């Protein structure tokens, strides 16, 4: 363990996790995260996503300020895009990410899976790898019948 280390001596990803853990210990009804995925590897992102889903499932409000649209698509039902203090879009991830001009104004990109599904010419737009694989596998299974 690192329980005896000064938090300032920890790596950035460890400090972020420590900060999240300390806020979780307070058991608040609202959690605000500012760029929680910065300095996180895949496992850290998965842990943070799991925490967010768990809190949401318990009726807690999780607000996150993010530029990582893949993480947003994987973990949040409602998305609000802001730029220069103005709300540009508010809706489900699919609704918001379908608004090209809004994304351009906010200097954001669609999630990579959404970009890929559009580049491949799929009629349906996918937000997550899991969603794409599930749908494509069911199409393959239907063709085999």
Where are the language model's segments positioned?
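Conserved ABC nucleotide-binding domain
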Residues: 1-8
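A short, surface-exposed alpha-helical micro-motif characterized by mixed small hydrophobic
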Residues: 72-74
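ABC ATPase nucleotide-binding domains
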Residues: 103-145
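Catalytic Walker B motif of ABC-type/P-loop ATPase nucleotide-binding domains
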Residues: 31-34
């Amino acid at each position: 363990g690192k329980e005896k280390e000064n938090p300032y001596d920890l790596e950035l990803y460890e400090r972020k996790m420590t900060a999240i853990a300390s806020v979780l210990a307070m058991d608040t009804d609202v959690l605000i995260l500012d760029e929680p995925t910065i300095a996180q590897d895949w496992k850290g992102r998965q842990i943070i996503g799991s925490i967010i889903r768990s809190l949401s499932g318990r009726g807690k409000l999780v607000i996150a300020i993010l530029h990582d649209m893949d993480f947003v698509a994987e973990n949040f039902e409602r998305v609000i895009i802001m730029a220069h203090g103005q709300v540009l879009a508010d809706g489900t991830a699919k609704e918001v990410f379908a608004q090209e001009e809004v994304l351009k104004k906010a200097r954001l990109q669609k999630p990579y899976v959404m970009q890929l599904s559009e580049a491949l010419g799929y009629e349906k737009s996918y937000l997550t790898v899991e969603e794409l694989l599930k749908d494509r596998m069911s199409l393959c299974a239907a063709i085999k019948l």
